[in-house]
Each structure stands twice: as structure tokens, then as C-alpha cells.
Amino acid sequence: MKKNTATIFLSFIMTLVSINSFGQDNQIRQSQKSSVTQYVGADTKITINYSRPAVKGRVVWGNMVPYGLAAPDKYSNGKSFPWRAGANENTTIEINNEVKIGGSTLPPGKYSIHMIPSKSDWIIIFNKNNNQWGSFNYDESEDALRVTVTPVEAAFQELLTYNFGNITDNSVVAFLHWEKLKVPFQIKL
């Protein structure tokens, strides 16, 4: 009888642990996932996947998101690193055809997007490693392309957003919009 009671008790505890663990997976994220897709030309598909942090009354540029590379920390193996251009997992861009960004060719594929902000021009990095958490393990040797762009002042945007504008038959401007800045980069066929 003791053995049977112990088995029932252990089964009950395991069920509680399983239910609790399962419930953890369904928590609402602080920075919700989002995605935006644009077609250009006959069949070029561009998709940006990202997570959307909120301003929440904070100063973003030069504070929450530092200018230049972020200082080394315990997650980055003592190395400085660029901003992940969003929150949580890497922000990614996926293109199905060759395009030009900043006059340079980017082959078809899926790339992580990282940025190095400054008070004037920003560097946007398209990196071949598209499956990591943030930019902590960013490796410059895996860069597919780096372009320099100039951010522009914009209306206040609480949640980080990527979108497309200035759409033509052979080009589009993709941009990040957050706080009071837009960071545009033109994509040409």
C-alpha cells in the first residue's frame, strides 16, 4: 500500500510540474514578434521578421540603445557588439532574389540585421548568422554586407516597427521606425 501511495503522489507531482512548465511557454512577450513583407518587380519577395520593444517613457537613442558598439558584458564573451535592431532573437531579412543595398550586391538568402547607431550616420549590417539571440555572439567575419545610412527625424513611434515605402517597379525603401527616428535603406533590383 505504501508503494502504491508513493507512486500516486509522485505521479501527481510530475503532473503539476508538467502543467506549470507547459504554461510557461504561453506567456505574453514584452516585445511582441512581428513580420512585414513586400514584393518588388515581378517576383522579388522581401520579408523582415523582428520583435517590437516599446519606448515606455525611456530615452532610446544614445541611452537604452547606445551609440557605437555596446560595451562587452557577461553574455558577449568580453566582446563589444552592435545592436540587434529589435529585441529578443535576431531581426532577420529574407530575400529570394539578388538585390542591391547601398550600391552593393546582397545575394538571395536570410540574414540577421544588426546596426551601429551614431548621432549622424548609422551602419546597417547584414550578417549570414541569422539564428542567434540578440547580437551577443555577433561575428564580423560572417558579414555579407555593411551599408552606411542617415537616419531622419520622424513622428513619435512607441513600438519599434519595420515597414516599406517609396515603392517602384524596381526598388523599395525599407525602414526601421522607433521613438522619433526612421532609419531607411533602399533596396534595388
Description of each model-found segment:
Residues 1-25:
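Bacterial Sec-dependent N-terminal signal peptides
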Residues 24-107, 112-189:
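Targeting-peptide/extracellular-domain and disordered-appendage signature
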